[in-house]
A protein has these predicted regions:
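Cytoplasmic helix-loop-helix junction between adjacent transmembrane helices
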Residues: 2-40, 55
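Intracellular terminal tails of multi-pass secondary transporters
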Residues: 87-122, 272, 297-362
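Glycine-rich segments within core transmembrane alpha-helices of 12-TM secondary carriers
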Residues: 31-65, 72-79, 270-284
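Interfacial helix-cap and linker-helix signal at transmembrane-aqueous boundaries
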Residues: 51-61, 166-167, 198-200, 287-295
């Protein structure tokens, strides 16, 4: 029951945080910010190993409590303290943040409206969540990104079993195993953040995501081919970590800068993509059964299949958005020769955004 309650309150945090960032930053700024949020997972994985190693080796029996109990107490208290602080220091949306002046609110909303190609800097009219759900569900791009996120989450499933994979190197001491889990995540943190910076600076998304996906596939293929070499396996895990988290740190920024109008549609699209990603967590854990020890070739083979699916999604989204941008140019410059069926598929907000110069980031 405790785990059920924990999952219930945790579930909305990540998509809510993604949507929150998209309500403050333009598409030229959001990549690095979202990468920092997502790279928090990498830092938590890296330092959780270090913290766990220290607690498990040094606090067993303190206060007549087992070390694993201290692990939950310390990490739980840290989360609680940060959550309470966030209640007071985290701003609300640009239109409702109390400590912003009216002029600052208009500026904050205006820069986002201009970025999305909208004329209005005022609060949008309240739209029912059901309407946003219908809009998002009928948009093929929502499901392209949802499929990409599902494939990426399945590819990251190895991280849940990384300590077990490290044990296959021959280490029996749990402290040593936990310490060895940190370096791949720290390197992946630098990789993901660097590519997010490049993506923002160059206003590209598919190329960084595609390069990271290819790197993950190379690492996975090498793990399958040279799985008997223990330290080679550890080295190749760096490639997989960099690649998979490099994709993960890029795609949510890509989604939020693609489905921009209206905001309720963006919120639902982010939620649907995150839901599909969580579905992957349900089945991907079964890739790592004990019967696949010690090389886990079948497990890595499953990951390779989902990485290939992710790469195909990246290429499909790139092709779809590039073709849409070409049609947008026609709509802006030569509306009289524009495909009328294409125009009908755009809602009023999207049509206005296109005429104001909005283009997808590819």
């Amino acid at each position: 029951m405790v785990r059920l309650f924990l999952g219930f309150v945790e579930a909305p945090f990540f998509p809510g945080a993604i949507y929150f960032l998209s309500c403050w930053y333009t598409k030229r700024e959001i990549g690095v910010r979202m990468a920092l949020l997502i790279c928090g997972i990498l830092l938590s994985n890296a330092f959780a190993g270090l913290i766990s190693a220290g607690i498990l080796s040094g606090m067993n029996g303190v206060g007549n409590l087992a070390s694993w109990r201290w692990l939950f107490i310390i990490e739980g208290l840290a989360t609680l303290v940060v959550g309470v602080i966030a209640l007071f220091v985290l701003p609300d949306f640009p239109s409702t943040t109390k400590w912003l002046t009216q002029e600052e609110k208009v500026i904050a909303q205006g820069r986002l409206a201009a970025d999305a190609g909208s004329d209005s800097v005022l609060d949008e009219e309240k739209v029912p969540i059901t309407r946003g759900l219908i809009w998002a569900a009928k948009d093929p791009r929502t499901w392209m990104f949802a499929c990409l996120q599902m494939a990426t989450t399945a590819s990251i499933s190895y991280s849940h079993f990384f300590p077990t994979l490290i044990k296959q190197l021959g280490f029996k001491n749990n402290t040593t195993v936990l310490l060895l889990t940190s370096p791949p995540y720290l390197v992946a943190f630098c990789w993901a953040l660097s590519w997010a910076w490049v993506a923002d600076r160059r206003q590209i998304r598919s190329i960084p995501a595609g390069i990271s996906q290819c790197l993950a596939m190379v690492g996975t293929i090498l793990l399958i081919a040279i799985g008997d070499s223990l330290w080679a396996r550890y080295g190749f895990s760096f490639l997989v970590a960099c690649g998979t988290f490099g994709v993960y740190a890029t795609t949510y920024a890509w989604l939020s800068s693609t489905i921009t109008q209206p905001p309720i549609k963006r919120a639902v699209a982010i939620g649907l993509a995150n839901t599909c990603a969580n579905i992957a967590s349900l089945f991907a854990n079964y890739f790592w059964l004990d019967q696949y020890e010690p090389a886990y070739r079948q497990s890595w083979g499953c990951l390779l299949a989902f990485q290939a699916l992710g790469l195909s999604c990246i290429l499909t989204i790139r092709f779809t958005l590039k073709r849409a941008n070409k049609k947008f140019e026609s709509l802006s410059n030569e509306a009289d020769v524009m495909d009328p069926l294409f125009i009908e598929r755009l809602n009023a907000d999207e049509r206005k955004a296109v005429q104001n110069g909005f283009r997808y980031i590819v």
